[in-house]
Amino acid sequence: MAQLEADYPGIRFVYVTGHLDGTGAAENLNLRNQQIRDYCAANNKTLFDFADIESYDPNGISNYMVLKADDHCDYDSNGDGSSDANWAANWVAANPSQELTILASTICSDCCAHSQPLNCALKGRAAWWL
C-alpha cells in the first residue's frame, strides 16, 4: 500500500478491516484487524472498519464480536460455542419504526449478500460518510 500511495499521491486510499468470521476476540482475524486499526490511527489513514460495524447493533451497547459474531450477524448468546442468535434480526424486531429498520426492510431487503439487510444498511451509511 505504501508504494501505491507513493505512486499516486493525489489519491486517498481507504483501508478496510476483514469481516467477522465467528472466531472471536483472541483469534487471528481480530488481531489482524486491530493491527490495521492501529496502523491507520498512527499514520492518519482512512479506515472503513467492516469488523466494527459488524460488531455492534445501532444502539452500540453490546460488542457481538467477543460473542463470536460473524458477518451474517449470528452470534453465541449463551457461551455454549454455537451461534444461536442474530443481533441484526433481534434489533429490527425490537425497533420496527426506526429509520434503519425501514431502510433495511425496503431498500436493502433483497440485495444484501451473505448478511442481514440491517448490516448492509449500516455499511452503506458508513460508506456515505467516507
What is the meaning of each model-derived region?
Residues M1, N33, R37, G124-A127:
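Extracytoplasmic/secreted envelope proteins and their assembly/folding machinery
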Residues M1-Y8, R12, H19-A25:
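Catalytic cores of nucleophile-dependent amide-cleaving enzymes
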Residues Q3, Q34-Q35, Q98, Q116:
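Residue-identity detector for glutamine
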Residues E5, D38-Y39, N119-L122:
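A general structural signal for short secondary-structure junctions and capping/turn motifs
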Residues A6-V14, A42-L47:
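Loop/turn elements at helix/coil->beta-strand transitions in domains of secreted/extracellular proteins
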Residues G18-N59, H72-C73, S77:
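Substrate-gating cap/lid alpha-helix
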Residues L47, K68-L130:
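Histidine-centered active-site loop/cap adjacent to the catalytic His
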Residues Y64-M65:
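Mature extracytoplasmic or otherwise solvent-exposed domains
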